[in-house]
Amino acid sequence: MIPREHVVGVDLEVRPDEVLDVLIEKGHSRIPVSRGSLDRIAGVIYARDLLATVRHGGLFTVSDLIRPAMFTSGSKRIAELLSEFQRNNTQIAIVQGAEGRTIGLVTIEDVLEEIVGEIHEDVPLRPAG
């Protein structure tokens, strides 16, 4: 889980170009969108949705692009969380504490790493033998 203080998100009121800047700068493909506070998540924005919309032109706002957020509790077991990701066809969830406050964010990659170990990205493939 990514703790709250390390969660990268944007406010619903920012301009789309600002969202793109954050996605590029931080290297994320999905980030939460909030209404003034991480405790008020409006949804999640996917880089591919933003890029496709920018490429096709036209006027749009961040709210036009957000997808519903998946919320989960910090006490959920790994197997349950994986099932939730599959059922909701998503790869990111907002983790809430007992009082409904956002305590962090978890991705399907986090879950898979708990099961199979660290996943290293951009590792060149080596021939066997």
Region roles according to the model:
Residues 1-129:
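Cytosolic regulatory modules rich in charged/polar residues
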